[in-house]
Design a protein with these regions (language model features):
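Non-catalytic positions within long, well-ordered alpha-helices that form the structural scaffold/packing
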Residues: 70, 136, 177-178, 254
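A structural motif
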Residues: 74, 140, 181-182, 286
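Divalent metal-binding pocket/active-site signature
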Residues: 59, 85, 93, 142-234, ...
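Charged catalytic cores and adjacent phosphate/nucleic-acid-binding surfaces used
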Residues: 31, 35-49, 62, 135-140, ...
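N-terminal secretory signal peptides and thylakoid transit peptides that target proteins
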Residues: 1-17
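A metal-dependent hydrolase metal-coordination microenvironment
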Residues: 41-167, 171, 263, 267-271, ...
Length: 300
């Protein structure tokens, strides 16, 4: 994520977001006791495949980042620092080489957690043009793309017409599916803080089904990011409404056979904090067979 105020927002809201998810789970349990639908069964996921370090806008150096993953007894993490216009990894070949070398050195010094060399690039326009080329991607093991401040026609200069905006978002994702070296789409449909805001329920189901079918066919992973509330905190959507709408999105993509990952999108001390992500997957009844298995990701 690229907004400059992200850390400040997270300091004030991370606890609230986690509490909202916990309260929602508590409400579901109470409803079950009253005879309504039973709560979703817990889904055991123990990876975090979208995280950041000091090589972009994260808070911690790589050695500490991996030490935290070991302390939290995660099975796997992906270090996915930003490879976007103006970022240090994109500007400096030397910095990119240093980044890869440091991940390799630190992960090789321990056996507790599987660590993947990754990056989070960004879409540059609605055609699926991207900020990371194939040559650099070939050096990586887990490549994510997002919509961010450089994504023309979506988060950058969004159309004033909400329907056109929603179509632009889906068409951008359809274009990204054609990028062979793309593994996953970061926090899909993160369009709540723009003007106009496009909420999960605003996306046309026919377009979503088209995208879901293509993601499943091309093996592109849907990133269920724990702090999705960040991307909607300026919208009129209440946190639990966001959860309910996002669950419906995930259900649609799961029905098409799309594979999912969970992530914290950690920028500070949230590594492994995927409580909301797992809640969404459980409520959407996503089977374990449609969750990424990091052990099967080839390391280079």
């Amino acid at each position: 994520m690229v907004p400059a105020n992200r850390r400040d927002f997270l300091r004030s809201s991370a606890v609230l977001a986690t509490c909202a998810a916990a309260c929602a789970a508590g409400d579901a349990t109470a409803q079950a006791a009253a005879g309504s639908a039973p709560p979703a069964s817990p889904l055991r996921v123990n990876h975090d495949l979208h995280t950041h370090t000091l090589y972009s806008d994260g808070a911690h150096p790589i050695p500490l980042h991996i030490t935290e993953a070991r302390a939290f007894e995660l099975d796997a993490i992906a270090i996915t620092d930003h490879y976007t216009p103006g970022s240090q990894l994109a500007k400096s070949e030397e910095m990119f080489e240093r980044y890869l070398a440091e991940i390799e050195r630190e992960r090789s010094a321990q056996q507790d957690v599987r660590v993947l060399k990754g990056a989070e690039a960004t879409a540059l326009d609605t055609s699926g043009r991207i900020s990371l080329d194939a040559r650099h991607a070939a050096r990586l093991e887990w490549v994510l793309f997002d919509l961010g401040g450089s994504s023309e026609g979506t988060l950058r200069h969004p159309p004033s017409d909400k329907q056109q905006y929603a179509e632009n978002v889906v068409r951008t994702y359809l274009g990204l599916c054609d990028v062979e070296y793309l593994n996953g789409i970061s926090h899909p449909f993160n369009t709540g803080n723009t003007r106009p805001a496009v909420l999960p329920a605003d996306y046309p189901p026919a377009l979503l089904r088209e995208l879901a079918a293509k993601m499943a066919a091309r093996g592109k992973v849907f990133d269920v990011m724990n702090d999705m509330v960040y991307w909607f905190h300026q919208s009129p959507l209440a946190p639990r409404q966001l959860t309910a709408q996002y669950v419906e999105l995930v259900k649609l993509f799961a029905a098409a056979g799309v594979t999912f990952q969970v992530s914290s999108d950690d920028h500070r001390t949230g590594l492994g904090n995927t409580r909301w992500s797992e809640l969404v997957l459980a409520r959407a009844a996503v089977p374990a067979s449609q969750i990424v298995d990091p052990r099967k990701i080839v390391q280079r």
